[in-house]
Amino acid sequence: EGACFFIIEPEDSPRPGYALVQGYGSRSDRDGVVCSGLYGACSDAIINAGLKITDTECICAWGPGHRLVDKAECDSLKMLFGRSLVNIPAFSIKGALGSSLGAAPAIQSAAALLGMRDSLVLRTVNWSSRDPDCSLSLSADNRRLDHGNVLVNAHGIGGVNSAVIYSKC
């Protein structure tokens, strides 16, 4: 269980914000193919943000710890980022919190935004060694990185995939 909410204000708000919602994408999976819509959702978010693939500086992965879903997510991200995927710091919060189901993407976003604010790529709790089938750049330790753009992706039961690009204010 979990919950999270955001107050989204206009860009010209007098109060300082954590980040800009720069771009968004959403796609559905093809019948029976897990995470098949994730590539399109992430690609759409980057395009919608007006960014290039190379502008993605950090990834907050769905990373549920399920071998099939983790591999499918990683394959989608490999298809999008190619060989540069190993150079993009990534993390997942599922090892710390488990899955909060519908609240998980909002909680992921909060973690990603706090990391961006504090110039950190958060650690992936309970992660210890690289899976040969997954080329995400995960770490068991927090890493310092002053990053301006973070991609947060999610995959829901029933095949809904979403991705958001947040950019530092």
Q: How should each PLM-predicted stretch be described?
A:
Residues E1-L51, E57-C58:
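Condensing-enzyme catalytic core mediating Claisen C-C bond formation in acyl metabolism
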Residues E1-S13, G102-C169:
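Conserved beta-strand-centric core segments of catalytic alpha/beta enzyme folds
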Residues I8, Q22, K78, F91, ...:
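Residue-level detector of conserved, well-ordered beta-strand and adjacent loop positions
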Residues G23-C35, C60-K71, N87-L136:
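Acyl-CoA/ACP chain-elongation machinery
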Residues G37, A41-G50, S76, L80, ...:
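Stable alpha-helical structural segments in soluble proteins, enriched in small hydrophobic residues
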Residues I53-D55, L85-N87:
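Short acidic capping loops at alpha-helix termini that bridge into adjacent secondary structure
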Residues D55-T56, H147:
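Local beta-strand N-terminus motif with an aromatic residue
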Residues V69-R83:
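Active-site-proximal gating segment of KS-fold condensing enzymes and close homologs
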